[in-house]
């Protein structure tokens, strides 16, 4: 349970964003839906001010990806600005079902490859 008294008396430090990596999209959507609903309900009792800008958003998910090259190497791409936000990254490093192609062959992502994608973002 959230301590609502503490939340109602405090001012947010920075807006938040969520980066849900491959294999965590469903969890990211669930967390996002909860945060959107919770913060909208909390903002009903607040007055709007500069400190509260970005507190209640339609979505906290960011557009990010880790595209793979033909060699199996990848790069992290964030398609929007995250300057000045608190970024939370969701990654399931034990998800073996995510695949990518290397030299025409299907390869399953190992925990190390998931961790490398986490570091790239």
What are these regions (language model features)?
Residues 1-121:
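PRPP-associated nucleotide enzymes
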């Amino acid at each position: 349970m959230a301590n609502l008294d503490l939340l109602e008396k405090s001012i947010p430090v920075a807006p938040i964003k969520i980066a849900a990596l491959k294999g965590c999209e469903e969890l990211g959507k669930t967390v996002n839906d909860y945060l959107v609903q919770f913060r909208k309900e909390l903002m009903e009792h607040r007055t709007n001010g500069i400190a509260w800008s970005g507190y209640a958003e339609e979505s906290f998910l960011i557009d990010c990806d880790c595209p793979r090259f033909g060699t199996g190497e990848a790069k992290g791409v964030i398609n929007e600005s995250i300057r000045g936000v608190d970024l939370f990254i969701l990654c399931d490093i034990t998800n073996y079902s995510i695949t990518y192609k290397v030299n025409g062959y299907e390869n399953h992502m190992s925990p190390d490859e998931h961790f490398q994608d986490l570091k790239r973002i």
